[in-house]
Regions:
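Hinge/beta->alpha junction and helix N-cap segments in small-molecule ligand-binding domains
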Residues: 101-114, 130-139, 161, 183, ...
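C-terminal motif of bacterial Sec signal peptides marking the signal peptidase cleavage site
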Residues: 15-18
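Hydrophobic alpha-helical segments within soluble ligand-binding/sensing domains
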Residues: 75-85, 91-92, 140, 193-222, ...
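Hydrophobic alpha-helical
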Residues: 154-174, 243, 261-324
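Flexible loop/hinge segments that line or gate small-molecule binding clefts
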Residues: 162-200, 318-327, 381
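An alpha-beta-alpha
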Residues: 102-104, 117, 205-253, 258, ...
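Bacterial signal peptide processing site
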Residues: 20-23
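Hinge/cleft segment of the Venus flytrap/periplasmic-binding protein
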Residues: 60-96, 227-228, 246-247, 339-384
Length: 384
């Protein structure tokens, strides 16, 4: 892996955002896409024109050439070199049009994934058409139809409804457009899926709490408080199960209590407060499914004066929790990172190789996880 510096290849990535139901590409937008594709083709053949060569030399950053006829790489700054691995051996044979349908443009994790896809598209010299699924099945289906009408070559779909994913996959197959489903499968055993190990997401948290509880509270029998979000589907259920199983395998007598956060930090705070009121004594291991809600949990613990009685693990590695990780006296031990920053860099080489020569991605690709603690925070996030 090498550090790359940012330079936008002129016209390589046309970003279109489809946000409302029934949205279709306007003639003006289509013209912009056509113009961008033309510019990309011109940049690809710049070696044959001395004037274009001079322009390339004076542009910000440099291009890395592949074989004759392939789209050159544009160097892009990699902000998190300990997280992102750039496949420098893959080159696009053409300026393909990649559609990326985001889970929800208002979700912090989704935004990171979207930006990683855009950066990877810039690097590989392909166009990117961006959609927002809005966590809405109907919108996800509409986005698929719009992408088909726009003539995309590949579809990257981040959506957590399996039935809609399957319908999208079938519709794309009718048009000969390949797909990778992100985080949640489409058609089992048919469509490639890129997803984290949700069960391991929970076990990493449980393992850390078991270790810390034994060291911090020798001879004590702490209870386990699990703040999950089962309404959001199997991925979140698996995370909670992983945490519980990890703790119970090491401490089988542990009493377990569960709530739903309903995906809301304030609900998390209030239900944690109620739990602490009902359990005014003893040591507690706490787990929460996402960092933003963990902050609500922490607020309840602080208000109750129970900081010395509680240890907390979380999920997401969102910057909102980094300040707590830096504190030696914080009850927050760690947060599991799924490294959303690398998703696009993993996905684009698979898509490009399939478009180049028909090499289909594996049915399952699982990126690495790690739990971010005070000890390794700056290794992964130097600017935290």
């Amino acid at each position: 892996m090498r550090k790359l510096t940012l330079a936008l290849l002129l016209g390589t990535c046309a970003v279109l955002t489809a946000c409302s139901s029934g949205q279709t590409a306007s003639s003006e937008t289509a013209a912009a896409v056509t113009e961008a594709a033309s510019e990309t083709a011109s940049a690809e053949n710049a070696g044959s024109n001395a004037e274009e060569e001079a322009a390339a030399e004076t542009s910000e950053g440099t291009q890395v050439e592949g074989a004759e006829g392939q789209i050159p790489h544009t160097e892009v700054e990699i902000k998190y070199p300990a997280i992102i691995e750039v496949n420098e051996d893959v080159y696009a044979n053409e300026p393909y049009k990649i559609a990326y349908a985001n889970w929800n443009d208002e979700n912090s994790i989704s935004i990171i994934v979207r930006d990683s896809v855009l950066d990877a598209c810039k690097y590989y010299g392909v166009e990117c058409m961006v959609f927002d699924n809005k966590q809405d099945p109907n919108q996800a289906m509409t986005n698929c139809e719009t992408a088909i009408q726009a003539g995309v070559d590949y579809y990257l779909n981040f959506n957590q409804d399996e039935s809609i994913n399957a319908a999208i996959a079938e519709r794309l197959e009718q048009e000969g457009i390949p797909l990778i489903s992100i985080q949640t499968k489409a058609r089992d055993g048919i469509d490639p899926e890129y997803h984290i190990d949700n069960y391991k997401f929970g076990t990493l948290c449980g393992d850390l709490m078991v270790e810390e509880a034994a060291e911090r509270w020798p001879g004590e029998q702490p209870i386990l408080f699990v703040a999950g979000h089962p309404e959001s589907g199997v991925n979140f259920i698996q995370r909670a199960e992983g945490c519980k199983d990890s703790v119970l395998s090491a401490m089988p007598e542990t009493e377990v209590f569960e709530i739903s956060t309903e995906g809301d930090p304030e609900v998390t705070r209030q239900r944690t407060t109620d739990f602490l009121t009902a359990h005014p004594e003893g040591k507690i291991m706490m787990w929460c499914h996402i960092d933003q809600n963990t902050m609500g949990m922490l607020a309840a613990v602080t208000a109750a004066g129970r900081l010395d009685d509680v240890i907390i693990t979380s999920c997401g590695a969102n910057p909102v929790i980094f300040e707590e990780l830096k504190k030696e006296d914080s009850p927050v031990l760690g947060t599991v990172a799924q490294f959303s920053e690398r998703f696009g860099w993993d996905l684009l080489p698979m898509a490009i190789e399939q478009l180049n020569d028909g090499t289909k991605p594996p049915l399952e690709t699982v990126p690495p996880l790690d739990i971010i603690t005070r000890d390794n925070l700056y290794t992964y996030y130097p600017d935290a």
